[in-house]
Regions:
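Conserved nucleotide-binding and Mg2+-coordinating catalytic segments in signaling enzymes
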Residues: 10-32, 53-67, 75
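Short regulatory alpha-helical coupling segments
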Residues: 11-14, 27-47, 78-87, 105
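A short pre-motif secondary-structure segment
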Residues: 90-94
């Protein structure tokens, strides 16, 4: 009986930490994870990367195709993210609505850039039709990536808010792309063919 109770508790804990629709970590778990990663990166003077991404013209997609198809689209994108997760290095979560966050630890800027580009390509390869998009005939994503070694005056939300700014820059650069910034570089929209 005690083993059943422990197993049930583990299932409940797992449900409380994961998004029901996508199976990715939820925002509560993400916040806890990001705080721990930030503290570790600060103490060890290691690079921390935060990426915010969302689906381009997702409201129009939902309005045109319906919420059931919208849910399928979110699950397909989550499937791409589940494939790129690396325990202890690449952590993916649903941030809310059609937004996702990826936390990168123990990696170089080049590795982070490559993974971001891989995500973009994988989403393109899904070829989910999107008649209402103004940037592609398929579902596409925009990504904002910020990576640096945390400084004394930083907090984890500084990384989140900077990634959010970069996401909006990616949208202003035409969407279906990535805007990346580090402590040593200015914001750069990366065009991926």
């Amino acid at each position: 009986d005690r083993e059943n109770m422990q197993a049930s508790n583990r299932v409940l804990e797992d449900l409380a930490m994961h998004d029901e629709l996508t199976g990715l970590a939820n925002r509560t778990y993400l916040h806890e994870y990001l705080t721990g990663c930030f503290e570790h990166a600060y103490a060890e003077e290691k690079l921390l990367g935060v990426e915010l991404m969302d689906i381009d013209f997702f409201k129009e997609y939902n309005d045109h195709y319906g919420h059931l198809m919208g849910d399928r689209c979110l699950k397909a994108i989550a499937g791409v993210l589940q494939k790129i997760q690396i325990p202890g290095q690449v952590f993916c979560a649903r941030y809310g609505g059609d937004e996702f966050m990826i936390v990168y630890t123990g990696m170089t800027v080049e590795q982070i850039r490559r993974i971001s580009e891989d995500i973009l390509r994988e989403v393109r390869m899904l070829k989910i039709p999107h008649e209402c998009s103004r940037c592609s005939k398929y579902v596409s994503i925009s990504q904002g990536v910020f990576a640096r070694i945390p400084m004394e005056n930083n907090r984890e939300w500084d990384f989140t808010s900077r990634a959010d700014e970069l996401l909006y820059k990616a949208k202003n650069c035409g969407r279906d792309g990535i805007c990346l910034s580090t402590e040593k570089s200015s914001d750069k929209c990366i065009e991926i063919k």
